[in-house]
Swiss-Prot record:
UniProt family annotation: Belongs to the protein kinase superfamily. Ser/Thr protein kinase family. CRK subfamily.
GO biological process, one term: defense response to bacterium
InterPro entries: GNK2 (IPR002902), GNK2_sf (IPR038408), Kinase-like_dom_sf (IPR011009), Prot_kinase_dom (IPR000719), Protein_kinase_ATP_BS (IPR017441), Ser-Thr/Tyr_kinase_cat_dom (IPR001245), Ser/Thr_kinase_AS (IPR008271)
Annotated Protein kinase domain residues: 363-634
Gene, per the UniProt record: CRK6
Cellular component GO terms held in the UniProt record: plasma membrane
Annotated organism of origin: Oryza sativa subsp. japonica (Rice)
Residue ranges annotated as Extracellular topological domain: 32-294
Designated name of the protein: Cysteine-rich receptor-like protein kinase 6
Amino acid sequence: MRRHRPYLDGVAAAAATFLLAVLLHAPLAAGEDEPPPWVLCGPYPPSGNYSKNGTYQVNLDLLSTTLPKNTSSSPAMYATGTVGDVPDKVYGLALCRGDANASACERCVAAALRDAPRRCPLVKDVLVFYDLCQLRYSNRDFFLDDDYFVTTYTLQRSRRVGAAAAAAFDAAVAVLVNATADYAAADSSRRYGTGEEEGVDGDSDRPKIYALAQCTPDKTPEVCRTCLSTVIGQLPKEFSGRTGGGMFGVWCNFRYEVFPFFSGRPLLQLPAFVETPPPPPSPSATSGEKTKNRIGTVLAIVMPAIAAILLMVVACFCCWKRIKKRRPEEQTFLSYSVSSDDIQSIDSLILDLPTIRVATDDFADTKMIGQGGFGMVYKGVLPDGQEIAVKRLCQSSRQGIGELKSELILVAKLYHKNLVRLIGVCLEQQEKILVYEYMPNGSLDIVLFDTDKNRELDWGKRFKIINGIARGLQYLHEDSQLKIVHRDLKASNILLDFDYSPKISDFGLAKIFGGDQSEDVTNRIAGTYGYMAPEYAMRGNYSIKSDVFSFGVLVLEIITGRRNTGSYDSGQDVDLLNLVWEHWTRGNVVELIDPSMGDHPPIEQMLKCIHIGLLCVQKKPASRPTISSVNIMLSSNTVRLPSLSRPAFCIQEVSASDSSNPYSERYPRPRHSGYSDNSTVVSSNDLSITELVPR
């Protein structure tokens, strides 16, 4: 049977008149689901009927010819439209599920427009929900309505878990659904998210759970999350103990099941929900364990480090001999194969050399703003007034041609607001030049590690930078047409625009993964000490989790204002990761917060970011979160952060009397009261290792 209930949006309660909810529990044939579509005829206070073959029906038929194609051709698979004039004007809206392809989307919307008049004959206001799409048309302008119409449904095969397990299962569902809602609200392009939460092995009442959440993409993150929060709030009442259910609405919807019901890999993956986290180790126990394991820990770090250094010395010698034998003509740009697709993507970006010479005053020294691993970077202005950054490969040096080609092909295919944008390329007269949008605030390291400039970075800007880097990295790892590992994520490769929004740059060392590939190995290590993941620095194994490690280092650098010196050298007594970890375990990590941010920073939010940073630099790649999970952690207050273990490359602390104490003058503590105005920058991690290989 069906029943109706009203509910109000928390934000727009004053404006909304009421909300209609329908619980579908109609008996079905054994073993069958209630088949879509779910249809509501006249969901709002009755708006009347239209006349057969009248003006309203003509307008509705016209809408039916355009709305399916408009929806499927939209990047977000969402469209609205109007036809005719009041009082016979038709307002229409269609949204396809985020995992639907364009053809399936178009078919679904077309079917909904055919079915709706048959199921609700001559009704002016109709709401239809299919599995892959939803449709509403009305004689009312509902596009700016503050209220939501929601239908709640459960599938017949949805069962109830045992009474004893219901509370734990409901809690697990709530964690996943809320995290997925956070993801959807944060998705700037589609407002769509899917999630998966691991089950508990051997417990039939705690299976793996899948969830999907979506809003119409025209909603802001705040409105989307408010809508989802409101409908998710019905979980305890409607779905307690049930293994599946969901709600459809005009502006937002969610669903969860214990089986995969959406296409593709979940965008969010969570570990099994644990009701009671294990208690933290006592200080005395931690101290005892440190003493017991000190020798083993030091040996575990020192021996691989020595072996790695010896291997790198041998590798450098071999490379030197190989380069010495190489003839100049062998090292040309054309020696690096370029596919026809690559050429097609590059062709539209070609700039002529005279234009670039004029833009940079013929590469004047006064226009030089930096130096990369392959040459100089100049500031320029195109004839239309656009400011540009020009990266010019040194003609006298053959180093970097492979990097240039790799970067050109990759960046030409990528577009995201947190990736630096490629404007053009010039390959005339033996010049190899890339032209990028100009970033007025330079690179992050220039601002962050300068004792004067870092005062420009208050916590709001730093948190925006952390979020932006994470979103850009997620695009590279999961959301772009290519699956890319950057391999050289560091502060100097994060550029800042006029309002300090970050953009990831320098894709010369990036690698593309195909299909389901998640990791690879190389005997040519390339990157920057201090940011390399241990498995990459020591064994050449790299994956998306290598980038996550680099991101974690960046987070800790941004919060503390200190460079990570790295600890691949066994003679290095301490690095930033160790410093943060020791303070974290002692409960005084707040002392490491960069004092240049002022007197009253949001400590709780900073501690959360430090926790996330430490999660990202765990020694084992499997212990690090995916970057999509990091984005959820950053944007959500409902996700419980996993517990921490000692990060990679941490060396046991020395005694307080030791002259190499990490809290000596080399690493002075900021004064806790009011924070000190003095900021100490430790030794630079500017050592990069690059071995260029034709790709």
